[in-house]
Amino acid sequence: MMTMFEEVEVEAYVYPTEDIRKVKKAMLNLIPGLQFEAFDKGEYVILVGRTKDKRALQRLYELFRGQQILDTARMMLEEGYFGEEIIIKVHKQVAYVGKVNFNEDSPLGPITITIRTKEPQKLMKWLAPRTKDGVPIE
């Protein structure tokens, strides 16, 4: 697979009731190979993971297909696309069990994934192509 992005950044707020290791696991379930930094804000910790690994999006690629959510994924990518960034928000607890859910209305806040890319259209087409009857057509 060719590299279509410069960096993937994943961010989540970790609240006192949460185990930071579980939040890290949830993030790594979607984007493997993240290097983490944590910023303590008192009320919560902001956990930020970054990677430039060219295989970073492979797991999302597989989940979008395995869960048969290509159309929804494409819509969310297009909605979150601004210039050279694509931003999507996913449900934290669902990510912990290794799945993607774009319903971000979780009481503990979403996981935010930012993809920095010079080729957003090409990346979206690869990650979540348009489909007809569930079959990719582009």
Curated annotation (Swiss-Prot):
Pfam families referenced in this protein's UniProt entry, alphabetically: RNA_binding
Disulfide bonds: none
Family: Belongs to the UPF0201 family.
Species of origin: Pyrococcus horikoshii (strain ATCC 700860 / DSM 12428 / JCM 9974 / NBRC 100139 / OT-3)
Name of this chain's protein: UPF0201 protein PH1010
Highest rank taxon of the organism: Archaea
HAMAP family reported in the protein's UniProt record: UPF0201
InterPro entries: PAB1135-like (IPR002739), Ribosomal_uL5_dom_sf (IPR022803)
Gene3D superfamilies assigned: 3.30.1440.10
